[in-house]
């Protein structure tokens, strides 16, 4: 099940990256 846990970790990473990019975008506008 390592593939499944990797996928969920990766999606969590993408979510946090998107959230960070969103905060930066908010601060820049």
Swiss-Prot record:
One of its GO terms (molecular function) is hormone activity. GO terms for biological process: adenylate cyclase-modulating G protein-coupled receptor signaling pathway; negative regulation of apoptotic process; positive regulation of insulin secretion involved in cellular response to glucose stimulus; protein kinase A signaling. Induction: Produced in the A cells of the islets of Langerhans in response to a drop in blood sugar concentration. InterPro entries: Glucagon (IPR015550), Glucagon_GIP_secretin_VIP (IPR000532). It is found in: Secreted. Coiled coil: none annotated. Keywords: Hormone, Secreted. GO terms for cellular component: extracellular space. Belongs to the glucagon family. Glucagon plays a key role in glucose metabolism and homeostasis. Regulates blood glucose by increasing gluconeogenesis and decreasing glycolysis. This is Glucagon. It comes from Lampetra fluviatilis (European river lamprey).
């Amino acid at each position: 099940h390592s593939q499944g846990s990797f996928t969920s970790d990766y999606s969590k990473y993408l979510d946090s990256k998107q959230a960070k990019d969103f905060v930066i975008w908010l601060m820049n506008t």
